[in-house]
């Protein structure tokens, strides 16, 4: 994996500028700025590196939205580089404007949910969790079970 990755980044025909940089952007009517940290900045591209268990055939929507924030913040073409044991699969993120609109819509949906009440637990009860999803750890599952009154 290390050799594949090393060879891949050595072959990029673009001037390297910076690593682990910060972007801060304003999106639409959202009252707080979006802050993100990209992995690699080149003269013409901003790249985010993702390690994955298997080779990817395309960019996930969440990663495309993340890279689009970096693109707006840097003014560069966004790329996601998926690194697996078999090599590097680089993908250019297309439709940055559409992805930024999705970020804004998600933020507005969250803002609407939070506007229902000053009580965060009431806001949480506006949705119902899928505790079978891998993202839930044991500690957060216990808290969720308490909030949503879910049995074992």
Regions flagged by a language model, labelled:
Residues 31-35, 42-44, 76:
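Coil-to-beta-strand transition motifs
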Residues 1, 62, 102-105:
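Soluble or luminal CAZymes and related metallo-dependent hydrolases
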Residues 17, 30, 74-152:
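Metal-dependent nuclease catalytic regions and adjoining charged, substrate-binding loops involved
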Residues 21-25, 50-51, 82:
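Short, structured patches in soluble enzyme cores that scaffold and shape functional sites
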Residues 55-63:
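Active-site-adjacent loop/helix micro-motif of nuclease/hydrolase catalytic cores
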Residues 1-38, 136-152:
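Metal-dependent nuclease catalytic cores that hydrolyze phosphodiester bonds in DNA/RNA
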Residues 63-74:
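An active-site-proximal "capping" alpha-helix that borders the catalytic cofactor pocket
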Residues 38-56, 70:
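Conserved catalytic cores of phosphodiester-cleaving nucleases, focusing on short active-site segments
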């Amino acid at each position: 994996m290390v050799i594949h990755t090393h060879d891949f980044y050595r072959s990029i025909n673009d001037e390297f500028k910076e690593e682990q940089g910060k972007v801060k952007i304003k999106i639409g009517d959202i009252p707080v700025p979006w802050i993100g940290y990209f992995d690699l900045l080149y003269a013409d591209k901003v790249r985010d590196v993702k390690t994955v268990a298997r080779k990817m055939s395309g960019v996930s929507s969440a990663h495309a939205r993340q890279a689009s924030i970096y693109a707006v913040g840097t003014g560069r073409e966004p790329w996601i580089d998926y690194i697996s044991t078999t090599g590097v699969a680089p993908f250019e993120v297309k439709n940055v404007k559409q992805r930024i609109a999705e970020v804004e819509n998600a933020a507005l949906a969250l803002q609407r949910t939070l506007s229902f009440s000053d009580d965060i637990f009431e806001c949480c009860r506006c949705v119902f969790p899928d505790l079978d999803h891998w993202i839930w750890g044991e500690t957060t599952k216990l808290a969720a079970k308490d909030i949503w009154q879910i049995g074992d």
